[in-house]
Design a protein with these regions (language model features):
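Bacterial Sec-dependent N-terminal signal peptides
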Residues: 1-40
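Short, ordered, surface-exposed loop/turn motifs in non-cytosolic proteins
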Residues: 37, 44-59
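A short, amphipathic beta-strand motif
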Residues: 37-43, 70-72, 107, 118-119
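Short Pro-Gly-centered beta-turn/loop motif in secreted/extracellular proteins
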Residues: 50-51, 74-81, 357, 368
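Hydrophobic beta-strand segments
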Residues: 53-57, 84, 121
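A short, solvent-exposed loop/turn motif at the edges and junctions
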Residues: 57, 85-96
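Short, acidic Ser/Thr/Gly-rich low-complexity loop/linker segments typical of extracellular
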Residues: 61-71
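Surface-exposed, low-complexity/disordered segments
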Residues: 105-370
């Protein structure tokens, strides 16, 4: 009897040790996947630390504000194709392209030289109110979410119409701050370039070409509001990241997407269009041979391999234009090379007013009071 009890006790202890080992391995795996990005921000000229600088993962709600010693710390649970941006009023924004593999301990930022380029304006043709309205239509969009947006520092925006090139040009010496009341976010956008070139000589008429370069982060100002959470979910499910995440996980059909050629009713099966495999921190997507055009057409002068219609419901018809036969998608639904694909139609029309953080639904947002 004593021997039997010892055997049972020994088995129990062995099972407990195995359980604790597996539990510890789970914690180790989680900690290995997570990364903590740290560093110190310095003024390049005087070599002093810079407090109050925003340091963020581009396009996300993951950020920190440097302390009195210029230090920052950002936790990211997965490696993604996103840069790290340092922004401070009075300084040029600085970008670290691959912070997950090559983040320096010290990042230097330089004071901004304030100057506007040559401005060619046809005097009296358009009021500032008209220019701002045209800018908002192309910058924020015209949806319910976009119409709820308020530019909180609109007076600091420099805007003019170049009458020689029929181009609306917008600049700002500081981040443009946008309150999106519909989605419960405050957006901070460093706008390096935003130009809207119209096909005719009238502001806001025709389908324009838009050139812009920017970086952005989101402050979650209403993280527990159920109505706003439902709005976010609805907006996200019509977005490009949602489509790309579904594609990367072989869940396009499950997510309600149909693929077709020029929106005809002969809907292509997902597996007949793409082959998806694992590739380190990305999903590798190969465009199947049957979809590759032998006589490559062009989109704004750029040759492309294929073009597919994307349908999710009656109000969400889009097109995806494939400039390559192979592309890579990270866990946030970002492309390793953004120029590999282009979207037109519904998804192509979405602007900053309908944008959510790239880490939406994956990483917890940070927020601070304003």
């Amino acid at each position: 009897m004593l021997v039997e009890r010892k055997v049972k006790h020994s088995k129990t202890m062995k099972i407990m040790r195995i359980f604790l080992l597996l539990l510890s391995l789970c914690f180790i795996t989680g900690s290995l996947n997570a990364q903590i990005l740290t560093g110190i921000i310095y003024d390049r000229e005087n070599q002093e630390s810079v407090p109050g600088a925003y340091v963020y993962i581009e396009g996300s709600s993951l950020f920190d504000i440097t302390n009195e010693e210029g230090k920052f710390e950002i936790k990211v649970n997965t490696t993604v194709n996103a840069s790290l941006v340092v922004s401070h009023i009075g300084y040029n924004s600085t970008t670290v392209l691959d912070p997950f593999t090559s983040l320096p301990d010290t990042i230097f930022i330089e004071e901004k030289a304030f100057s506007l380029g040559e401005i060619v304006v046809q005097a009296g043709r358009y009021s500032r109110k008209q220019l701002i309205k045209a800018f908002c239509n192309e910058f924020l969009g015209t949806s319910s979410a976009a119409n709820s947006c308020v530019i909180e520092n609109e007076d600091n925006i420099h805007i003019w119409f170049n009458s020689r090139t029929n181009t609306l040009i917008t600049e700002c010496d500081e981040p443009i701050i946008i309150l999106n009341r519909y989605l419960g976010f405050r957006l901070y956008i460093n706008l390096e370039k935003f130009e809207v070139e119209y096909p005719g000589r009238q502001l806001g008429v025709g389908l324009p070409l838009i050139y812009f370069k920017s970086s952005i982060f989101f402050n979650d100002i209403d993280p527990i509001n159920r109505r706003i959470a439902e709005r976010r979910k609805s907006v996200f499910e019509g977005s490009r990241p949602f489509f790309l995440r579904a594609l990367a996980n072989n869940q396009l059909e499950k997510s309600g997407y149909w693929l077709s050629d020029n929106f005809n009713k002969n809907v292509s099966k997902i597996h007949e269009c793409f082959t998806v495999t694992d590739s380190l921190d990305f999903k590798k997507v190969i465009v199947n041979q049957e979809l590759r055009s032998q006589n490559r057409a062009t989109f704004y002068g750029i040759p492309y391999w294929s073009k597919l219609g994307i349908t999710r419901d009656d109000n969400e018809n889009s097109e995806i234009i494939l400039f390559t036969d192979t592309f890579y998608i990270d866990s946030w639904g970002q492309l390793s090379q953004p120029d590999d694909l282009a979207f037109t139609g519904y998804m192509g029309s979405l602007r900053f007013g309908d944008q959510l953080p790239l880490n939406y639904g994956i990483e917890s947002s940070r927020s601070f009071s304003q």
